[in-house]
Amino acid sequence: MANKRKKVSVIGAGFTGATTAFLTAQKELADVVLVDIPQLENPTKGKALDMLEASPVQGFDANITGTSNYEDTAGSDVVVITAGIARKPGMSRDDLVSTNEKIMRSVTREIVKYSPEAIIVVLTNPVDAMTYAVYKESGLPKEKVIGQSGILDTARFRTFVAQELNLSVKDVTGFVLGGHGDDMVPLVRYSYAGGIPLETLIPKERIDAIVERTRKGGGEIVNLLGNGSAYYAPAASLVEMVEAILKDQRRVMPTIAYLEGEYGYEGIYLGVPTIVGGNGLEQIIELELTEEERSQLDRSVESVKNVMKVLS
């Protein structure tokens, strides 16, 4: 019997959603359904058709459709949520909470109605709280609802380190813990260039500057763009997670996972090292933290909890 083609639905056809859809199709991970609200159905269909017409040129075989009808998403293996209002200059992530929570709850009801077996990956900001809202609304096990921020934050950290050392980014590894915000915790002790600890290659003050730039990475792009926020790197980070799930790769990657006692926290979604595979979240990896790292993580958790207080 022939293998059934995989199906990924991307909710939200803005810059991030559309880029996620295109990269997913380009890598031939699955057929893609791009979804947006009825008022934007034609532009969504137009983007999907434009991507599809790129397939003969790029040489990929994946069907891409645009729609506002959730029935078209039925039977999805993975659903990615990028829908929501965007952050504007000067706007804190917390300002987004109430509006985006309503969007998350409404979208989630449609997802579980048509794809009850799907694994859901959330990107919408503030992502720790929005992933929690999706989890609560969905009724799915925690393994099937995960958020994306750590891959993006780690990618930014790796980029800045590679620039500092004038090395290939391929040789730089790192890990970022905590919430997706100014209190994220880049774990410098677990960061390497070609297997060599960063602390032996870069002076402390330069590492501190890189950590600070990583924390402000999203805001830096928001300010440069003047209108809108980052989308290429967030989309690429999402697709790395989608690939790990669809191919059951069991990749070690930082994701936003629901904690039930891990790291000493309970009932909260937080960025931690995890193993991602065919079941979604396969395992949470607990690292030994120094006192300073622990206190930074506590601060990060408090920030996430403060955002979660706004949730209904």
UniProtKB/Swiss-Prot annotation:
The keyword Transferase does not apply. InterPro entries: L-lactate/malate_DH, Lactate/malate_DH_C, Lactate/malate_DH_N, Lactate_DH/Glyco_Ohase_4_C, Malate_DH_type3, NAD(P)-bd_dom_sf. It is an enzyme of class 1 (oxidoreductase). NAD(+) binds at G12, A13, G14, F15, T16, G17, D36, N100, L123, T124, N125. The keyword NAD applies. SUPFAM superfamilies: LDH C-terminal domain-like, NAD(P)-binding Rossmann-fold domains. The modification Phosphoserine is found at S149. One of its GO terms (biological process) is tricarboxylic acid cycle. One of its GO terms (molecular function) is L-lactate dehydrogenase activity. Pfam families: Ldh_1_C, Ldh_1_N. Keywords: NAD, Oxidoreductase, Phosphoprotein, Tricarboxylic acid cycle. Catalyzes the reversible oxidation of malate to oxaloacetate. This is Malate dehydrogenase. The lineage of its organism: Bacteria, Bacillati, Bacillota, Bacilli, Bacillales. The gene is mdh.
